[in-house]
Amino acid sequence: MALGLLIAVPLLLQAAPPGAAHYEMLGTCRMICDPYSVAPAGGPAGAKAPPPGPSTAALEVMQDLSANPPPPFIQGPKGDPGRPGKPGPRGPPGEPGPPGPRGPPGEKGDSGRPGLPGLQLTTSAAGGVGVVSGGTGGGGDTEGEVTSALSAAFSGPKIAFYVGLKSPHEGYEVLKFDDVVTNLGNHYDPTTGKFSCQVRGIYFFTYHILMRGGDGTSMWADLCKNGQVRASAIAQDADQNYDYASNSVVLHLDSGDEVYVKLDGGKAHGGNNNKYSTFSGFLLYPD
């Protein structure tokens, strides 16, 4: 189309009479289609002649262009790929994956340190257990003292008892706990109700006595060492018939000392095999 216009414009200029018209340079279409013409000679003054139509040569050019349209555009080759874009924002974290397979076993560890030495024990003719004392060693450091204390605590003689009261008692008498559950070392005698020390050291004792009431009286229970009261407990009959008296002690005992529980008035309830009233103790560590 542009080629046709370039050919048609000069032809139109040649076909127009000299001085008959001038063209306003406002674009090729207006130059061809909208010329300004002056009034022809002999016409009324100031009259404007009608615009002349296209020339024969211009019409031939336009017909030739419509009969033979310009060739179609040819698509060029594909261009090179563009540059990579900028990275996008980070996406949200994904869901946790399934657990992986179990790994192989690790290597064998180093051997542990040697354990604490135990105490050498001997058995007497009566079946009791005694401790063989060694000679006095030299002064050790703090670590050696701790080791000796642990050795004595965990490797010393095992002494413990736990007994219950089957028969009821009242008045002022030693409670004979005749239901023996535990008696390591055989240091408790159920016929006397007394614990007899054979290994010097620190011991723990506790007792719980159920009062048999209903008559408005109270009950006292004392833990004694060699006849001396070391702990006391009281239970009162406050319109409920039954009440407990309990206490605990930590004592240092020498060989031959005796520990027991004695009533100091009132009534103690015997529980058959239910063990409502109990007495127990054990060796914390020997001297």
From Swiss-Prot:
Covalent S-S links between cysteines: none
Domain C1q per the UniProt entry, residue ranges: 154-287
GO CC annotations, alphabetized: cerebellar climbing fiber to Purkinje cell synapse; collagen trimer; extracellular region; glutamatergic synapse; hippocampal mossy fiber to CA3 synapse; protein-containing complex; synaptic cleft
Domain of life: Eukaryota
Pro residues bias (residue ranges): 84-104
PANTHER family tied to this protein: CEREBELLIN-RELATED, COMPLEMENT C1Q-LIKE PROTEIN 2
Record's subunit section: Forms homotrimers which can further assemble to form higher-order oligomeric complexes. Interacts with ADGRB3. May interact with ERFE. Forms heterooligomers with C1QL3 and C1QL4, when proteins are coexpressed; this interaction does not occur after secretion.
The protein, known as: Complement C1q-like protein 2
Organism of derivation: Mus musculus
